[in-house]
């Protein structure tokens, strides 16, 4: 979203003063200042003669006599930021964190400082955000940086910078709720502290985090408590931007899976509503502009996102700002999204706009040149008319082609409009235009001057000034033109120097007779004051004024808008006088009108149709007791309400607010019937090939769209989940459909040839395009690839010289959805976009696997480029052959062959690939294969096939560290099939739970060729530990199983579930992304997994901790309404019955969906599992017959009302809080926290509705333990869990932070450990920051941060503890298990007095390997104890994470008295790492 303002900056240097030029008595008086550099950014303090200019090297200049004389602003260099809501206020952004503010139009300045550097960019955030009413309240936007990484820090002042306080960290922008002077005017029941309310966009993890929320506080976040903006009890997430438009707060949000943006609007900073857009394209993120708006509506231009020549659609909202109707399509805009739209200043309802007359051709690519025409509206955008100069159409240059500062066409001068353009059928280039003027607000126009000019208005419009301009600021001239009669006649005045005009400006209210011209001559620049005060001696009298009507109707009579006519007192055009009412802006007078239809807008639940009438937006709801019969009628809402602020007279006028009689056929559907509804559709096709177009959080509408391709190439589409279907009309058979990977609204259809189709509106309409070559026929090669952040960017793989399923493949790319193509590479295997904005990769990064010498018979190599291979190509691995590569989350993984070994490499930035270190003694042969399984928790799960005999494939699952460079063994002998699919599945939503099937007789399979026998395993701590699954105690009939166990599975008795390798549809899963904790699978109880035919159906409600049998035999399943409905149907056998459960599988009900038995091939619903509709895909009696049954559960009485979830009391109504268990750990902490989820109570008779934010804000962070750390760079995990330096490598340079960040005070010595990126743990064991050292030349700052202790303190610290320490050390050494000197990751210790987390071990008191270690550890002990006593328990690093200062024994010896202590750390930190001569390199 973009709110445009023209703020221009530059530089100048004052050189000398030129004497004033004495003009003739009938011309203006001109005074000149000379400059070496062009003066820029002139700013007038409103209602004063004070003007400021920005200068060279940020020097500022000031004039207090309307630009006649200038002086440097002493000792206050910087950039000027005016407060546009308080005309006397401005702030100077100065260097070196020193700034100045004025509140009296630069008469006095107040100096202030901010600890961090302020944020500033021309297109991005500004350093200061001003309050709409109180000039003393300012938000200050800063950032703190560590090396090249920066984060936002926001400050605020409420007393005009006398005091400055910190507001928030990690925000993405903060804004006052009262951000404009008129916000909340006339509103009732406003918050008590609305003037103090601040909204902030807050990202918990990264600036690109899709969970960005809009939070707010009325106490400046002083109590660390804040609330997030909600609608219907659900937080708005994915917030991108917020804008303050007159009386409106406008919020834009986005979500994964769609480019559609959601717009939310509030008029009171309390209640928010989602804006709906009718009659035009959907609003897409980054492609709409909020335009200049009114106090009673918002104007938005929504751009077409595909074309390099963008074109928009203009929408206008109702007074609530939530219902938008398209005014006109084809609005001209440029690539920066500036839009040719401007309202006429001071007059309601009139605006000028430029349209693209050939918009359809430009959008389709048939025309590369826009034909731009100008239009004007006199009725708030309801109708548009051409601008007329005589009988010719006039076209004017607008916002996309500015030539001066400020407004383009108009000023506060009533009714006077000027512009540069031409007559004819389209707008020509600026330099070919003339100057035109209108004195009746655009009704009629006349040519004022030949050629293009810059222009300005003065003395309330009685004076017009212009200077020749070529649009390039290069045309030298020594004269100006001026008119004293509204542009009818023009005179010229000589300038003292020949120069090119840069800016021509005057006071903001256009009441002055003095103008400022900034111009550039040959070698010199000028600031010229042009004063017309003496041109007319007479001041206008009352006879010289007219009562001018601001708007005229088609009959030339004064027109009404917002219930009144508008008039101005204006000087007559031919009066020979000046108004001379400086700083007195013209004020309109109004005359009330009788109410007409135009004074009403649509009320809630209604929208405008093409005839501008209000019609129901959906079904109406009658009063209780009405509409018992369909033929009845009832009195219902008219659909209209008077526009708030409209002051028309109702008496004698139209009143559309009265209720009207409506037919009952227009009402909402009847109450729930209690029945399940079924709709049947038959197709002719042997293959089942369907796809859902999923909805995202910000998707508008409520369709549930499915596309189906039949064997003959026909495409069928349903938008109501299979109740009704439409057949697509295409000229060629559809070969395949490809949904957009990152935008669920988009789908591509491919044919046998070059021709293809796309739809961006969920298959409502399709448009054709052509690739450069027919799509590839090479087996296994995908023909289309998409960019994750740019929905219109494509890579097309086309084939030439095809021989069967083998082609020479060429890759092409397009940035406009196939309108234009450019060649990437020849002889490719595959190409993909690898850049993503929330990762370290470049936006334009493309990876390709390319055959050597472009010959498909030769090996593939990996290449990449950031300029589409135009100039630069990076060849990775020195051109060695690669087996393949893949992109998983933030990782790019590649496999290469090195002799007899298969090697894996990983990159997170697309530039540098690091060799992945596999576990010791784990050799990966060249004949092995990789399968990348998952990387959702900042770790790569990799399956390495180490046994590849036909139909007996299996291997090992390895888990990487957070940068993919070091792997540990997760699970051996994991099953795989010949298609490279692996029996491994992460349970959705619930963190850390995964299931896998292993080959239990791996040795027999390897050495004796036996068939595989399987067992199922489950992990509850992200695949660090695995266990067999416990079987249910009883079967569904209440009988015991043949084997029994107590609490957990054994090799003789466990539950086993058929896995991923046996599924017919890879989209099926055992769990759901919205049904928290529910798992369903088909399997058996026993020592091994039996055949699928012998299996039964089992279900878990607690993420796999316990299971129960659902049905005897094997069933297919699907979750609906986020798990509140579970449907199962028999697999591979004829049936006419399905079963469903409304209580998470506790009880089941049978339902007969057909009267004849069919064999159900699949059961499906929307991928998010949020619908109450299902599709059963079945086979009937005749060959090739496919039957689709829509089964609709919305009529059930048990699902009639929507469930209630209140964030402030989440367990008060239909939900409860649930935390998953982690039985392989002593606590339920995983990744540093205990997760808490919202779950619907099984007994609650309601439906969930839209997807819930399942993860509760009640999440509890845990103290850090060893499980929250991994091995650091160049360290690798040992067999005992410790991290040791890789032989031959050195730790990363810890002093790099000092070199990269000049303000860094200290660095930490490497420990071998670093915190897991996903861990949110706090406190506890800080293993990554132990030994602190001062940066070079920062010794004093370091000592100030870590003060030492005196001699007496040392004596006390040594004398009293030494005896106890020695005794405890000896006792521990003799009694403990001897595991000194290591930190073990993922290792469980028995709970004992000396377990790793025992308090006696936590306090570092001489738990060491012998007497020498005890003695050398004493200084560390004493320092720790002393600092504990003094309270130095924690120091905060620049990134807000809790870190622990620490000193090694070496540091103590080298720097007596400058101890850096550690509190509550583990005994295992005290090892032998500092004895360099020792063989033991353990940490």
Swiss-Prot record:
Gene3D superfamilies in UniProt: 2.10.70.80, 3.30.60.270, YVTN repeat-like/Quinoprotein amine dehydrogenase
SUPFAM superfamilies listed in its UniProt record: Oligoxyloglucan reducing end-specific cellobiohydrolase
Glycosylation sites recorded in the entry for this protein: 295, 898, 963
Cytoplasmic compartment residues: 1369-1399
Location of the protein in the cell: Golgi apparatus, trans-Golgi network membrane; Prevacuolar compartment membrane
Similarity field: Belongs to the VPS10-related sortilin family.
This protein's name: Vacuolar protein sorting/targeting protein 10
Source organism per UniProt: Arthroderma gypseum (strain ATCC MYA-4604 / CBS 118893) (Microsporum gypseum)
Gene that this polypeptide is encoded by: VPS10
């Amino acid at each position: 979203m973009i709110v445009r303002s023209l703020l221009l900056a530059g530089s100048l240097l004052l050189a000398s003063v030129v004497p004033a030029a004495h003009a003739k008595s009938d011309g203006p008086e001109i005074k000149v200042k000379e400059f070496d550099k062009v003066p820029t950014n002139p700013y007038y303090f409103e209602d004063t003669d004070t003007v400021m200019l920005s200068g060279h090297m940020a020097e500022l200049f000031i004039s207090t006599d309307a630009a006649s004389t200038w002086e440097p602003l002493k000792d206050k260099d910087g950039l000027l930021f005016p407060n546009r809501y308080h005309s006397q206020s401005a702030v100077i952004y100065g260097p070196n964190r020193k700034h100045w503010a004025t509140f009296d139009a630069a008469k006095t300045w107040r100096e202030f400082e901010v600890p961090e550097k302020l944020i500033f960019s021309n297109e991005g955030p500004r350093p200061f955000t001003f309050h709409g009413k109180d000039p003393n309240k300012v938000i200050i936007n800063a950032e703190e940086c560590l090396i090249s990484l920066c984060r936002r820090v926001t400050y605020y002042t409420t007393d005009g910078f006398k005091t400055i306080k910190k507001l928030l960290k990690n925000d993405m922008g903060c804004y006052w709720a009262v951000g404009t002077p008129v916000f909340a005017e006339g509103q009732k029941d406003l918050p008590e502290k609305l003037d103090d309310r601040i909204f902030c966009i807050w990202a918990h993890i990264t600036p690109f985090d899709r969970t960005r929320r809009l939070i707010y506080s009325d106490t400046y976040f002083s109590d660390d408590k804040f609330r997030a903006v909600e609608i219907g009890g659900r937080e708005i997430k994915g917030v991108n931007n917020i804008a303050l438009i007159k009386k409106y707060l406008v919020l834009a949000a986005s979500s994964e899976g769609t480019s559609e943006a959601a717009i939310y609007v509030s008029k009171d900073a309390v209640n928010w509503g989602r804006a709906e857009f009718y009659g035009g394209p959907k609003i897409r993120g980054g492609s709409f502009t909020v335009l200049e708006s009114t106090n009673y509506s918002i104007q938005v231009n929504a751009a077409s996102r595909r074309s390099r020549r963008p074109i928009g659609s203009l929408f206008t909202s109702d007074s609530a700002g939530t219902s938008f109707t398209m005014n006109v399509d084809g609005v001209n805009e440029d690539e920066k999204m500036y839009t040719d739209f401007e309202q006429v200043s001071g007059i309601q309802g009139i605006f000028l706009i430029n349209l693209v007359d050939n918009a359809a051709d430009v959008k389709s690519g048939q025309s590369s040149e826009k034909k731009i025409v100008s239009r004007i509206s006199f009725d708030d955008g309801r109708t548009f008319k051409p601008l007329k100069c005589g009988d010719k159409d006039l076209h004017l240059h607008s916002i996309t082609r500015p030539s001066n500062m400020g407004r383009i066409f108009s000023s506060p001068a009533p009714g006077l409009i000027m512009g540069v353009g031409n007559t004819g059928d389209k707008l020509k280039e600026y330099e070919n235009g003339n100057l035109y003027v209108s004195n009746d607000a655009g009704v009629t126009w006349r040519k004022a001057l030949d050629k293009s000019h810059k222009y300005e208005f003065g003395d309330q419009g009685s004076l017009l000034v212009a200077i020749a301009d070529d649009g390039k600021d290069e045309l030298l001239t020594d004269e100006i033109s001026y008119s004293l009669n509204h542009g009818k006649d023009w005179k010229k005045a000589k300038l003292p120097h020949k120069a090119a005009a840069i800016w021509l400006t005057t006071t903001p209210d256009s009441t002055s007779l003095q103008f400022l011209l900034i111009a550039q001559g040959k070698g010199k620049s000028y600031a010229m004051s042009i004063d017309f005060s003496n041109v007319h001696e007479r001041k206008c009298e009352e006879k010289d004024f007219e009562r001018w009507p601001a708007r005229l109707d088609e009959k030339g009579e004064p027109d009404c808008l917002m219930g009144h006519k508008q008039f101005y007192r204006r000087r007559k055009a031919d009066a020979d006088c000046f108004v001379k009412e400086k700083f007195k802006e013209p004020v309109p007078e109004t005359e009330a009108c009788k109410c007409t239809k135009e004074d009403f807008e649509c009320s809630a639940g209604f929208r405008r149709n093409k005839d501008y009438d209000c019609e129901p937006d959906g079904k109406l709801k009658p009063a209780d007791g009405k509409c018992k019969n369909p033929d009845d009628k009832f009195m219902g809402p008219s659909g209209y309400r008077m526009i708030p602020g409209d002051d028309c007279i109702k008496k004698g006028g139209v009143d559309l607010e009265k209720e009207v009689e409506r037919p009952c056929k227009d009402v909402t559907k009847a109450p729930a019937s209690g029945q399940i509804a079924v709709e049947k559709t038959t197709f002719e096709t042997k293959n089942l090939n369907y796809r859902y177009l999923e909805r995202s959080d910000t998707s508008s509408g409520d369709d549930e769209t499915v596309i189906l391709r039949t064997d003959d190439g026909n495409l069928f589409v349903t938008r109501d989940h299979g109740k009704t279907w439409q057949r697509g009309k295409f000229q060629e058979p559809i070969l395949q459909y490809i949904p957009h990977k990152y935008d669920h609204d988009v789908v591509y259809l491919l044919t046998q040839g070059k021709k293809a189709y796309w739809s961006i509106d969920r298959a409502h309409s399709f448009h054709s395009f052509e690739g450069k070559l027919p799509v590839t026929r090479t087996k296994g090669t995908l023909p289309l690839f998409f960019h994750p952040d740019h929905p219109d960017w494509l890579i097309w793989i086309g084939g030439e010289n095809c021989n069967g399923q083998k082609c020479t493949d060429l890759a092409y790319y397009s940035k406009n959805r196939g309108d234009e193509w450019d060649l990437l590479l020849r002889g490719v295997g595959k190409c993909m976009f690898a850049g993503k904005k929330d990762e370290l990769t470049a936006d334009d990064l493309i990876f390709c696997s390319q055959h050597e010498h472009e010959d498909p018979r030769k090996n593939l190599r990996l290449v990449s480029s950031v300029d589409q291979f135009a100039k630069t190509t990076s060849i990775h691995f020195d051109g060695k052959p690669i087996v393949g590569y893949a992109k998983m989350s933030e990782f790019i993984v590649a496999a290469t062959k090195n002799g007899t070994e298969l090697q894996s490499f990983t990159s997170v930035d697309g530039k540098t690939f690091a060799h992945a270190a596999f576990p010791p003694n784990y050799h990966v042969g060249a004949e092995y294969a990789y399968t990348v399984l998952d990387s959702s928790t900042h770790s790569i799960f990799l399956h390495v096939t180490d046994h590849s005999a036909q139909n007996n494939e299996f291997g090992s699952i390895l888990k990487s560290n957070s940068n993919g460079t070091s792997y540990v063994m997760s699970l051996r002998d994991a099953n795989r099939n010949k298609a490279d699919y692996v029996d491994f599945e992460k349970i959705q939503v619930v963190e850390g739970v995964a299931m896998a099937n292993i080959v239990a007789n791996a040795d027999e399979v390897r050495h004796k060729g036996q068939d595989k026998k399987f067992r199922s395993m489950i992990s509850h701590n992200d695949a660090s530990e695995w266990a067999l699954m416990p079987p249910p105690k009883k079967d569904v009939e209440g009988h015991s199983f043949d084997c029994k166990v107590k609490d957990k599975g054994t090799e003789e008795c466990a539950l086993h579930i058929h896995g991923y390798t046996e599924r017919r549809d890879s989209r099926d899963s055992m769990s759901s992304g919205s049904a928290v904790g529910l798992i369903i699978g088909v399997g058996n109880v026993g020592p091994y997994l039996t055949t699928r035919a012998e299996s039964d159906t089992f279900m878990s409600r607690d993420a796999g901790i316990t299971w129960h049998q659902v049905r005897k035999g094997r069933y297919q399943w699907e979750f609906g309404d986020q798990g509140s409905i579970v449907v199962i149907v028999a697999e591979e056998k004829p049936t006419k019955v399905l079963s469903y459960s409304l209580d998470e599988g506790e009880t089941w009900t049978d339902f007969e969906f057909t009267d004849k038995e069919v064999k159900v091939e699949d059961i499906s619903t929307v991928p998010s599992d949020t619908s109450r509709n299902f599709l059963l895909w079945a086979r009937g009696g005749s060959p090739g017959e496919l039957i689709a049954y829509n089964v609709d559960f919305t009529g059930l009485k048990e699902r009639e009302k929507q469930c209630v979830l209140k964030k402030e009391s989440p367990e008060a109504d239909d939900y409860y809080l649930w935390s998953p268990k982690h039985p392989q750990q002593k606590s339920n902490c995983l990744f540093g926290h205990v997760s808490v989820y919202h779950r619907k109570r099984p007994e609650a008779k309601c439906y969930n509705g839209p997807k819930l934010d399942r993860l509760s804000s009640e999440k509890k962070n845990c103290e850090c333990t060893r499980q929250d750390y991994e091995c650091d760079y160049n360290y690798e995990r040992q067999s005992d869990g410790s991290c040791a330096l890789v032989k031959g490598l050195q730790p990363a340079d810890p002093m790099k932070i000092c070199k990269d960040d000049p303000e860094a005070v200290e660095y930490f010595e490497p420990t071998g450990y670093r915190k897991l990126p996903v861990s949110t743990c706090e406190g506890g064991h800080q293993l990554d920051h132990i030994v602190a050292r001062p940066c070079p030349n920062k010794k004093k700052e370091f000592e100030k941060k870590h003060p030492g202790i005196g001699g007496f303190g040392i004596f006390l610290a040594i004398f009293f503890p030494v005896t106890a320490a020695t005794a405890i050390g000896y006792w521990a050494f003799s009694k403990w298990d001897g595991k000194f000197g290591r930190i073990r990751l993922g290792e469980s210790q028995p709970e004992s007095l000396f377990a790793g987390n025992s308090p006696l071990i936590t306090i570092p008191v001489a738990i060491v390997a012998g007497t020498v270690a005890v003695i050398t550890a004493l200084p560390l002990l004493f320092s720790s104890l002393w600092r504990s006593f003094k309270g130095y328990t924690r120091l905060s690093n620049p990134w807000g994470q809790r870190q622990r200062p620490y000193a090694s024994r070496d540091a103590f010896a080298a720097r007596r008295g400058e101890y850096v202590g550690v509190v509550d750390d583990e005994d295992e930190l005290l090892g032998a790492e500092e004895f360099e001569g020792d063989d033991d390199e353990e940490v």
